[in-house]
């Protein structure tokens, strides 16, 4: 059983997918993390972010592992834990640029599809339901206004003791949205058969409840109660 959750950055996909994976006892694929790891490797090796051929070659030889630890998933690159490094704004922006290239996406496609070998999978990304797993049994598309997503990001930074600039955060989100929605290869859009969820005015618990209700209607049973984490 495969459940895909697509949507823009900051809509709450990470929190929703983590909750669903725990509730159902499914494996979790964070495709955004794969692109972030690719971007991090490119930055570390000073690979030109406009050179599609070099980036694709880099992507083909990445050693990426997802290791469940203490209720979270640690992400390893060549054996090194890069879970925190890939969450910086620099890496996020680089990942959005790297993801526009067809050769890079092709290089990473098989890596993502290999996760389907699990008995159950929650796939978090931007093209999970349209490209990577077009035959998934359940598809969700989670969205929120750019302003609301910027507020969430600003609050996250404040909670970490970081003084963010709201106007800059909003501008960066809008720029990334434009790139993601208008790229020629696998643009961000809901699958025709996806349930659309707008989290702009909803709490995370309300989003999870709506998603679970839809999943239940598809005949999927829950294994145990989930624990929620902040995205």
From Swiss-Prot:
InterPro entries: Cytidylate_kin (IPR003136), Cytidylate_kinase_dom (IPR011994), P-loop_NTPase (IPR027417). ATP binds at residues 7-15. GO terms for molecular function: (d)CMP kinase activity; ATP binding; CMP kinase activity; dCMP kinase activity. One of its GO terms (cellular component) is cytosol. It is an enzyme of class 2 (transferase). Signal peptide: none annotated. SUPFAM superfamilies: P-loop containing nucleoside triphosphate hydrolases. Its EC number is 2.7.4.25. It is found in: Cytoplasm. It catalyses: CMP + ATP = CDP + ADP; dCMP + ATP = dCDP + ADP. Keywords: ATP-binding, Cytoplasm, Kinase, Nucleotide-binding, Transferase. It comes from the Bacteria. One of its GO terms (biological process) is pyrimidine nucleotide metabolic process. PANTHER family: CYTIDYLATE KINASE, CYTIDYLATE KINASE/PANTOATE-BETA-ALANINE LIGASE. Belongs to the cytidylate kinase family. Type 1 subfamily. NCBIfam families: cmk. This is Cytidylate kinase 1. It comes from Haemophilus influenzae (strain ATCC 51907 / DSM 11121 / KW20 / Rd).
């Amino acid at each position: 059983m495969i459940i895909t959750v697509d949507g823009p950055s900051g809509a709450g996909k990470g929190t929703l997918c983590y909750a669903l994976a725990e509730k159902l006892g499914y494996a979790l694929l964070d495709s955004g993390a794969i692109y972030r790891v690719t971007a991090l490797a490119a930055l570390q090796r000073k690979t030109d972010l406009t050179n599609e051929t070099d980036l694709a070659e880099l992507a083909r030889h990445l050693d990426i592992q997802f290791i469940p630890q203490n209720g979270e998933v640690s992400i390893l690159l060549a054996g090194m834990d890069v879970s925190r490094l890939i969450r910086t704004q620099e890496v996020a922006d680089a990942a959005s640029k790297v993801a526009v290239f067809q050769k890079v996406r092709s290089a990473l496609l098989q890596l993502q599809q290999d996760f389907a070998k699990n008995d159950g999978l929650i796939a978090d990304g931007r093209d999970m339901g349209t490209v990577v797993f077009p035959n998934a049994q359940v598809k969700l598309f989670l969205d929120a206004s750019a302003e609301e997503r910027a507020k969430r990001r600003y609050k996250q930074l404040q909670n970490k003791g970081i003084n963010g600039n709201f106007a800059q955060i909003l501008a960066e989100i809008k720029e990334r949205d434009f790139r993601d929605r208008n790229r020629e290869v696998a643009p961000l859009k809901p699958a025709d058969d996806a349930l659309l969820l707008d989290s702009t005015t909803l709490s995370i618990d309300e989003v999870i409840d709506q998603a679970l209700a839809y999943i239940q209607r598809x005949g999927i049973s829950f294994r145990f109660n989930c624990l929620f984490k902040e995205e």
